[in-house]
Amino acid sequence: KYSRKDNPAVELMRRVIAAKKKTDLSNHDYYQYDKYQKITLALNDLKKEQLEGKFFSKRQYLLDQVETSPYNGKLTLPVSIDETVSQHIYRKDPKTEKDIIKGQQSNGIGQVIQTGEILNTALKDAFTDVDIYDDYVRLLQYPFPSPIGRTGISFYHYYIEDTVYVERDLCYHLQFIPANSQDFGFRGELYVLADSSLHVKKCNLYMPHNTDVNYVKNMKIEQEYTRLDNGEWVLSKDDMIAELHVNSVLQDLLVVRNTRLTDYAFDELPKILFKGKAKVRHDMDAMNRDEAYWNKYRQVDLTKSESSMDSFIHQMENSKGFKYIIFFVKALMENYVEIGGGTDGKKSKFDLGPVNTYISKNFVDGIRLRLAGRTMAALNPHFFWDGYAAYGTKSNDWYTGNIFTYSLNKKKNSPFEF
């Protein structure tokens, strides 16, 4: 039976949690670092029978895009990649933090559906940065107790496995699991430096299989910390691998987020950098960086399929039946279908959807048929309409609804974008 009393693992973790204050970067008056992030979305776990089937065998460009993922060893088909280079700056007094986007580019399926930018934003929001030195880790819109957070001792069970060397550093190797298997928490392992700093050198976090969160089938987070010349330990590597399963009909998805943090500095920063309330600022040329820029600042190499994404999309756009494929993809990903534009470079003025509401069934209406749609910013960037008409085949009743929205700010696609 697990006991916290006189437990060496618990006593060690109490010391690790207490030592957090000494190693907090916010103790400095200023700090900054550079950050590179790559997020890849791929069809996951493709089977040999699928690839030999009629759909793939008739589309060589799809077969050429298939590769074995280095993260799960499964056959995958990358469909989008988003890269961002940014600078994070911090000032203690008055407390201010900002991210300055230096470079950003997106390639893939988002290029051929007008709201692809929303897809990239949603992925970044769901698979956000993880800092185990926070008390809670917000992930997939849920707060998870950190294994070294203030509630860690009561939430997790810890077990010392051994003392091992990680690179050249002697570390305590610990395993941890939620005390209650039904709770939202991680399981995983920590490698804690066996010196006075008691800082985490490396950690692996896993989403328990019985945690039913936003279609996540499996998730792993790998983090590594690096010692700076001044003796401080800082996060340098943060990778996240998530396998998503929606249902038995749709293909599983793989999301891989690679983050690298470099060039930490603690010099005083000019006041002008902190001007304004916006927490995120874009450099003027951030969206127009050339290949030489990305070759210089890319911290994680692209896979063969990621690097050929432009060619893949070009072949897809020129393939037979492309419009039908995009129709299906958009219906699945966004629940809306563009009417006019979208595939020829022009933005849609009107979308049909939500598609999953077109046919439904209930006790009163029997089979209920519904037609719905919405206007887009290409029609008017300030004024939007969203409405529907539905008919119950059993009740013979008609139902209608209309929503009118006016946006003060000019929108690119829909009234709900940020």
Predicted regions and their residues:
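Extended lipid/amphipathic-ligand handling interfaces
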Residues: 188-194, 220-230
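Outer-membrane beta-barrel translocator/channel fold
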Residues: 215-216, 244-253, 405-418
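Transmembrane beta-strand segments that form the barrel wall of outer-membrane beta-barrel proteins
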Residues: 176, 204-208, 350-361, 371-372, ...
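Transmembrane beta-barrel strands of outer-membrane/channel proteins
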Residues: 35-37, 387-391, 418
